[in-house]
């Protein structure tokens, strides 16, 4: 689709979202478009420091967890001494960027709003690690904490997964992997999904939205996919194209959040409609006037904080509901 035919979303954003788009961090250099992946990762970490400031303080603990691929770093956020559940968080970044520090504020707020221990998983990034390594690392982390719950003062009878963007795909894929492989790490009471991609190769929203402002042009999405997958056949895998998995049974309750002007919004809509059609518990909410990745900007956008609180409320309600 010619770029000229796309919807001019920058003129339709909320005032708060426009303020974020136009915000210039003092001393921040331009995005290193021609830099190697490691340079881009360091820039992303630097750029996110401002957005992660002034986060709630709480007890944190870093733990290296053994997996079949080597140790994976995790960070435990404990807002109180005891927790009614454990929530595993997978960060976004197109499978190629991000770490526990780039999403620190999101995880701290989620821990505060749920009152539960949140465990961030610093899964291996692509292209150095290819599908399904990040999922298998996540499953290994869940298994480890299930077996060492007392050591870390965790309640793993009730667990959940959460993630944003690529992390949302990993969150849902990991939960389905546990179900499909009959791996028991606790009762998955909910999955919290913010503006994820779930396997669509094309859609109306991918044609109408996406540009330099969000890093989600058609070329960008193809690049992320090629970095993550081993080969073309992986595109149809039921843990990458999640619409090729069985979504008619035993899907944990899903909170599905989307951004109004996100090229990936149709992934969220289709996921919600599919689950709803098969009586799988789910809730869908679209946040008006927003772009992809708006969850990061809670320092300037109350709607980002609202989206986190909405997911937290969904999770807490499922803590009280026996499954």
UniProtKB/Swiss-Prot annotation:
Gene3D superfamilies in alphabetical order: alpha/beta hydrolase
The organism's place on the tree of life at top rank: Bacteria
Subcellular location: Cytoplasm
Cross-referenced PROSITE patterns: LIPASE_GDXG_SER (PS01174)
Presence of keyword Coiled coil: no
Keywords: Cytoplasm, Hydrolase, Serine esterase
EC number: 3.1.1.-
GO cellular-component term (any): cytoplasm
SUPFAM superfamilies documented for this protein: alpha/beta-Hydrolases
Motif (Involved in the stabilization of the negatively charged intermediate by the formation of the oxyanion hole): 91-93
Active site: 165, 262, 292
Keyword Membrane: no
Main localization of the protein described in the UniProt heading: cytoplasm
GO MF annotation terms: carboxylic ester hydrolase activity
InterPro entries hit by this protein: AB_hydrolase_3 (IPR013094), AB_hydrolase_fold (IPR029058), Acetyl_esterase (IPR023508), GDXG_lipolytic_enzyme (IPR050300), Lipase_GDXG_put_SER_AS (IPR033140)
Pfam name, any one: Abhydrolase_3
Family: Belongs to the 'GDXG' lipolytic enzyme family.
Record function comment: Displays esterase activity towards short chain fatty esters (acyl chain length of up to 8 carbons). Able to hydrolyze triacetylglycerol (triacetin) and tributyrylglycerol (tributyrin), but not trioleylglycerol (triolein) or cholesterol oleate. Negatively regulates MalT activity by antagonizing maltotriose binding. Inhibits MelA galactosidase activity.
Subunit comment: Homodimer. Interacts with MalT and MelA.
Classification via PANTHER family: AB HYDROLASE SUPERFAMILY PROTEIN C4A8.06C, ALPHA_BETA HYDROLASE FOLD-3 DOMAIN-CONTAINING PROTEIN-RELATED
Name assigned to this protein: Acetyl esterase
Origin species: Salmonella paratyphi A (strain AKU_12601)
Taxonomic path: Bacteria, Pseudomonadati, Pseudomonadota, Gammaproteobacteria, Enterobacterales
Chain's gene name: aes
């Amino acid at each position: 689709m010619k770029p000229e035919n796309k919807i001019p979303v920058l003129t339709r954003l909320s005032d708060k979202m426009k303020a974020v788009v136009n915000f210039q961090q003092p001393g921040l250099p331009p995005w290193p478009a021609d830099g190697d992946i490691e340079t881009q990762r360091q820039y992303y970490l630097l750029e996110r420091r401002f957005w992660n400031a002034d986060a709630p303080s709480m007890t944190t603990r870093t733990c290296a967890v053994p997996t079949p691929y080597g140790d994976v770093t995790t960070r435990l956020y404990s807002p109180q001494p005891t927790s009614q559940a454990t929530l595993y968080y997978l960060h976004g970044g197109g499978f190629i960027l991000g770490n526990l520090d780039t999403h620190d504020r999101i995880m701290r707020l989620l821990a505060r709003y749920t009152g539960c221990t949140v465990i961030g998983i610093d899964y291996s990034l692509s292209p150095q690690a290819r599908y399904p390594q990040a999922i298998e690392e996540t499953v290994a982390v869940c298994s480890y904490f299930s077996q060492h719950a007392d050591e870390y003062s965790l309640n793993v009878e009730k667990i959940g997964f959460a993630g944003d963007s690529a992390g949302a795909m990993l969150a849902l894929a990991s939960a389905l992997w546990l179900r499909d492989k009959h791996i028991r790490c606790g009762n998955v009471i909910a999955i919290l999904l913010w503006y994820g991609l779930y396997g669509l190769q094309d859609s109306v929203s991918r044609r109408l939205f996406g540009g330099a402002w969000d890093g989600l042009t058609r070329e960008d999405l193809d690049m992320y996919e090629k970095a993550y997958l081993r080969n073309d056949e992986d595109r149809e895998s039921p843990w990458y194209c999640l619409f090729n998995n069985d979504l008619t049974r035993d899907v944990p309750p899903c909170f599905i959040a989307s951004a109004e002007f996100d090229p990936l919004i149709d992934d969220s809509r289709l996921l919600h409609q599919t689950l709803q059609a098969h009586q799988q518990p789910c809730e869908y909410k679209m946040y008006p006037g927003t772009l992809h990745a708006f969850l990061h900007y809670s320092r300037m956008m109350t709607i980002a904080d609202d989206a986190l609180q909405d997911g937290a409320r969904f999770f807490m309600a499922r803590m009280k509901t026996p499954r």
